[in-house]
Design a protein with these regions (language model features):
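Bacterial N-terminal signal peptides that target proteins for export
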Residues: 1-7
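Pocket-lining segment of extracytoplasmic ligand-binding domains
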Residues: 95-96, 180-266
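C-terminal motif of bacterial Sec signal peptides marking the signal peptidase cleavage site
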Residues: 15-19
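Secondary-structure end/capping motifs
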Residues: 236-309
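Hinge/cleft segment of the Venus flytrap/periplasmic-binding protein
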Residues: 310-319
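Bacterial signal peptide processing site
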Residues: 21-24
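Short, glycine-/small- and polar/acidic-enriched structural segments
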Residues: 27-165, 176, 192, 211-214, ...
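Structured segments of extracytoplasmic/periplasmic soluble domains
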Residues: 54-57, 63, 81, 85, ...
């Protein structure tokens, strides 16, 4: 059962207050040959292809990092896992970290993770059924829209799309659904629209759905969607490890962005996506650099939509 994000933050705050940070029990010690054993909490989706590809290519081992990738339960366990030291690093969408940072969690971004394509109708987005009367994002006002997590990057950027199209986002009824359940829910009419990522975007479009909004693109050009992060305790305890991890991620991101065919192929090593579908997926961008202006936009949207009660301190959160 997926845990609400606010509950997850409460657990993480309790861990931080108890002093159970990564400077304690986390296992980042030297492995055989002098390598550092590093566990990274990830979500096994398309977006994390670069870290798997980087591991295959030896970008981490060449920096004496023995990398273990562990799946979080829909991402819910990753933030408290990093705070407690279960993971040395984690993968998260930016909005989740903005929310966590305003609640006092000792987190720091160390690397970019994934960015939007920056191309309207050629990115993840909002999909409606084939015979729907919804023609533009403005028509989502008053409709039921599925997102994977309430009060997070999905509903915040969908609202941005609706505003951009001239609609009123205040009347949207957001419904929380897991991504794999969204295409069937749309076909059955249980929701009017879904905000969906790959491979479920391709599934829904293959069933006749129509992409009416590229919400990441509408929110900001070249949106930084997700990043890799660590705890401040680990930065203080082992800054050299953090530096080596960041360097390996930078090389992994650049390689994946320049070699899309290899990025597609590595998906077969950690997902169950049909190889035929993999060739049709819309790939995101994996630039090594974080687009700070786009993170500021997400922070502004989070404040505007009530996801945070004060402006996030981006200087403290970003590298």
């Amino acid at each position: 059962m997926r845990r609400p994000f606010i509950l997850v933050l409460a657990v993480a705050l309790a861990l931080a207050a108890a002093g159970c940070g990564s400077s304690g029990d986390g296992d980042s010690g030297a492995a055989s040959g002098g390598s550092s054993q590093v566990k990274v909490g990830i979500i096994p989706i398309l977006d994390v292809a670069p870290i798997y590809l980087g591991k295959q290519k030896g970008f981490f081992s060449s920096r004496k990092i023995e990398l273990t990738l562990e799946s979080g339960q829909g991402g819910a366990a990753i933030v408290p896992g990093v705070v407690s030291g279960q993971f040395q690093f984690g993968f998260s969408n930016v909005t989740s970290l903005l929310i966590a940072s305003t609640r006092g969690l000792p987190l720091k971004v160390v690397s970019n993770g994934v960015a939007s394509t920056g191309k309207d109708k050629a990115d993840f987005g909002g999909v409606v059924a084939k015979d729907a009367s919804i023609r533009t994002a403005a028509d989502l006002a008053g409709k039921r829209v599925a997102v994977n997590t309430l009060k997070n990057i999905g509903d915040s950027t969908i609202r941005a799309s609706v505003r951009k199209a001239g609609g009123d986002p205040s009347s949207i009824k957001f419904v929380e659904l897991a991504f794999p359940d969204m295409p069937a829910a749309l076909q059955a009419g249980r929701v009017d629209a879904i905000w969906v990522v790959e491979p479920f975007l391709s599934t829904s479009l293959g069933q006749g759905g129509h992409l009416i909004a590229s919400n990441y693109v509408d929110a900001a050009p070249d949106l930084t969607v997700a990043v890799y992060f660590t705890s401040r305790q680990l930065i203080e305890k082992d800054p050299d490890l953090v530096k080596r991890f960041t360097e390996a991620m930078t090389e992994s991101l650049a390689y994946a962005d320049a070699h899309p065919d290899e990025a597609r192929q590595v998906l077969t090593s950690y997902t169950k996506i049909d190889p035929g579908v993999i060739q049709k997926l819309t790939l995101p961008k994996w630039p090594p650099q974080i687009n700070r202006a786009s993170v500021q936009t997400l922070a502004d949207l989070a404040l505007k939509d009530g996801l945070v009660t004060k402006p996030p301190d981006l200087a403290a959160l970003l590298p």
